């Protein structure tokens, strides 16, 4: 069963896909969205769902370090609710605290990637970390 991991921001959604057995996550792409205009990138998400035969979504929850929920948590949950309604597939949530920080550190320390290039892949890598954390927790 393939699972799609999503790192939801106000302008982009990082996408990761699990392998068919659900053991590993791979970063796939970054989808441009516009929350204010109600553009959530679902046309592209649908193409990916159909291509990979996705059966479940995992949406990252950007909780505060003290475990409280802020406005981005609410936005991520609203995005998850829209996914569930639009696709009719189950949506789980994964604590994503520090995933973007970890992703950026990996890109700097291990790949020595410039700031401009990091901006282009950071959300995809964060989605991969969110999904991998979810998969590790489940198995």
Swiss-Prot record:
Main location: cytoplasm
Organism superkingdom: Bacteria
Coiled-coil stretches: none
Name this protein carries in UniProt: Putative pre-16S rRNA nuclease
Organism: Streptococcus pneumoniae serotype 19F (strain G54)
GO BP terms, alphabetized: rRNA 5'-end processing
Disulfide bonds: none
GO terms under cellular component: cytosol
Signal peptide location: none
């Amino acid at each position: 069963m393939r699972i799609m991991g999503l790192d939801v921001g106000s302008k982009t959604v990082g996408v990761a896909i699990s392998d068919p057995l659900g053991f590993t996550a791979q970063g796939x792409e970054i989808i441009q969205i516009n929350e204010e205009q109600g553009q959530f990138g679902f046309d592209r998400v649908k193409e990916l769902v159909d291509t990979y035969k996705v059966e479940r979504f995992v949406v990252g929850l950007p909780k505060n370090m003290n475990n409280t929920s802020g406005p981005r948590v609410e936005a991520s949950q609203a995005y998850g609710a829209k996914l569930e309604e639009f696709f009719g597939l189950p949506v789980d949530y994964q604590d994503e605290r520090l995933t973007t920080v970890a992703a950026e550190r990996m890109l700097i320390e291990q790949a020595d990637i410039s700031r401009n290039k990091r901006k282009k892949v950071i959300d995809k890598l964060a989605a991969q970390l969110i999904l991998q954390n979810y998969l590790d927790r489940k198995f």
